[in-house]
UniProtKB/Swiss-Prot annotation:
The gene is SCT. Pfam families: Hormone_2. Its main location: secreted. Hormone involved in different processes, such as regulation of the pH of the duodenal content, food intake and water homeostasis. Exerts its biological effects by binding to secretin receptor (SCTR), a G-protein coupled receptor expressed in the basolateral domain of several cells. Acts as a key gastrointestinal hormone by regulating the pH of the duodenal content. This is Secretin. GO terms for biological process: adenylate cyclase-activating G protein-coupled receptor signaling pathway; diet induced thermogenesis; hippocampus development; intracellular water homeostasis; positive regulation of lipid catabolic process; regulation of appetite; regulation of synaptic plasticity; response to nutrient levels. The modification Phosphoserine is found at S63. Belongs to the glucagon family. It comes from Sus scrofa.
């Protein structure tokens, strides 16, 4: 009987403490800055300016006073480009020469072999005077 009472005294307090903690609700938490309850006027202005820059960047409408995004030069450049492309000798002089197709490098062929078809001699020579097939 004494062992039973001693066992009951040892196990009862932790059980009561665990049951008591689960029954009580947690105290209400004070509102925090991370909840968004506090915003200063400066942070509001920064957020609105950031959003405005993002929208302007997405839409592509920047102010005309912004020197880095001024696109007044594009029209004259396009005209010059069209004139350059219409002058073929100047274009051909500017472009590098390409090797002929039979001397072109191929990743599938070993060095020494060239791209193109190899033509072998006919197995039976044609008689003189008979036409060769094309």
């Amino acid at each position: 009987m004494a062992t039973r009472a001693l066992l009951l005294l040892l196990l009862l307090p932790p059980l009561l403490l665990l049951a008591g903690c689960a029954a009580r609700p947690a105290p209400p938490r004070a509102p925090r800055h991370s909840d968004g309850t506090f915003t200063s006027e400066l942070s509001r202005l920064r957020d609105s300016a950031r959003l405005q820059r993002l929208l302007q960047g997405l839409v592509g409408k920047r102010s005309q006073q912004d020197p880095e995004n001024n696109t007044a030069w594009t029209k004259s450049g396009e005209d010059r480009l069209c004139q350059l492309w219409s002058h073929m000798p100047a274009l051909q002089a500017w472009m590098p020469m390409k090797p002929p197709v039979d001397q072109a490098w191929s990743p599938w062929l070993p060095p020494g072999l060239r791209a193109g078809a190899l033509v072998s001699e006919p197995a039976i020579p044609a008689a003189e005077g008979s036409p060769m097939p094309p």
